[in-house]
């Protein structure tokens, strides 16, 4: 039995999956954002409850909005203040008496897609989230790749390529990022970036959904903005694909619902890739909000 926990800023979602990777239990509880001891106790209590229900000790995986320090094991997270700087994996292991896997929520999202029935034989899957922020996860042979310092897949904090900067024009905005740097992809390719760029070029605040609606209605500014953004995506994605050469790319987050992306990227990408490179298959993520808990559970599949 595989147990997954998607630990968010307001709730913890639990899911249990059997050996066929079918979900057999679901539960949601509020996140203890201020009391770390209660946070650990809540997770441990759910584990004990479902161990008793299924009569086995489930393998435990946690997905978090942050990362674990590769040297110390301390958590780096801002969405769950109680867990910041704490040793959640180690403390939970001590409490339940078994090993626990932990990874960031973007890797869990990617892992969930990689273990979809249709994709599970793909040698490599890249998950990219175009939501409030922009981030990603890298899956090789069914396992999340976290890297030496546990920052592999933090694609949102790679910088805008120089050709993307030129594409944005003479008055291109140098956008700041929450990480303290400027020019991070997170600030440009996210839904937030989509809106910020529109406001920069047209002097008007609009929500992404309204820009997309205006584009469908033929609004001149929206059409120009979407065309510019699609080319920006193609340039930046080509940069990432040249580095990692994934077989499949699964897109999640609010902007992934913009169907034009799946028409435009395959047409625009080739001119930005090496001549010998192939455009990977680009699909919309299938598992939506359940991706985090699925991926957390599947951290243990290859053990």
UniProtKB/Swiss-Prot annotation:
Enzyme Commission numbers on file: 2.7.1.59
Enzyme class, first EC level, given as a word: transferase
BP GO annotations: N-acetylglucosamine metabolic process; peptidoglycan turnover
GO molecular function terms attached to this record: ATP binding; N-acetylglucosamine kinase activity; zinc ion binding
Stretch forming the signal peptide: none
Record-linked PROSITE patterns: ROK
Residues binding ATP: 4-11, 133-140
Gene3D superfamilies: 3.30.420.40
Stated name of the protein: N-acetyl-D-glucosamine kinase
Catalytic activity: N-acetyl-D-glucosamine + ATP = N-acetyl-D-glucosamine 6-phosphate + ADP + H(+)
Pathway: Cell wall biogenesis; peptidoglycan recycling
Task performed by this protein: Catalyzes the phosphorylation of N-acetyl-D-glucosamine (GlcNAc) derived from cell-wall degradation, yielding GlcNAc-6-P.
Binding site residues for Zn(2+): 157, 177, 179, 184
Annotated SUPFAM superfamilies: Actin-like ATPase domain
Assigned protein family: Belongs to the ROK (NagC/XylR) family. NagK subfamily.
Keywords: ATP-binding, Carbohydrate metabolism, Kinase, Metal-binding, Nucleotide-binding, Transferase, Zinc
Top-level lineage group: Bacteria
Listed InterPro entries: ATPase_NBD, N-acetyl-D-glucosamine_kinase, ROK, ROK_cs
């Amino acid at each position: 039995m595989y147990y997954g926990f998607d630990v968010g800023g307001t709730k913890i979602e639990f899911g249990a999956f059997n050996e066929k990777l079918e979900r057999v239990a679901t539960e949601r509880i509020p996140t203890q954002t201020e009391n770390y001891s209660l946070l650990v106790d809540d997770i441990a209590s759910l584990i004990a409850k479902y161990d008793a229900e299924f009569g086995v000790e489930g393998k435990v995986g946690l997905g978090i909005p942050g990362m674990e320090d590769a040297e110390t094991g301390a958590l780096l997270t801002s969405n769950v203040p109680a867990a910041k700087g704490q040793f959640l994996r180690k403390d939970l292991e001590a409490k339940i008496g078994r090993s626990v896997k932990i990874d960031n929520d973007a890797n869990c999202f990617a892992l969930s897609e990689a273990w979809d029935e249709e994709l599970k034989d793909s040698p490599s899957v890249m998950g990219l989230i175009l939501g409030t922020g922009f981030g990603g996860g890298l899956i090789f042979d069914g396992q999340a790749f976290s890297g030496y310092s546990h920052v592999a897949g933090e694609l949102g904090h790679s910088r805008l390529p120089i050709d993307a900067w030129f594409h944005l024009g003479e008055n291109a905005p140098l956008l700041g990022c929450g990480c303290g740097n400027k020019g991070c992809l997170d600030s440009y390719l996210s839904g937030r970036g989509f809106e910020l760029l529109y406001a920069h070029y047209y002097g008007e605040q609009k929500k992404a959904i309204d820009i997309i609606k205006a584009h469908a209605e033929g609004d001149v500014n929206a059409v120009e903005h979407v065309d510019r953004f699609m080319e920006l995506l193609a340039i930046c994605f080509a940069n990432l694909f040249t580095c990692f050469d994934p077989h499949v790319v699964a897109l999640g987050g609010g902007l992934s619902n913009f169907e034009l992306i799946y028409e435009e990227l395959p047409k625009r990408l080739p001119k930005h890739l090496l001549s010998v490179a192939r455009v990977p298959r680009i699909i919309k993520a299938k598992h939506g909000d359940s991706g985090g808990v699925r991926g957390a559970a599947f951290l243990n599949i290859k053990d």
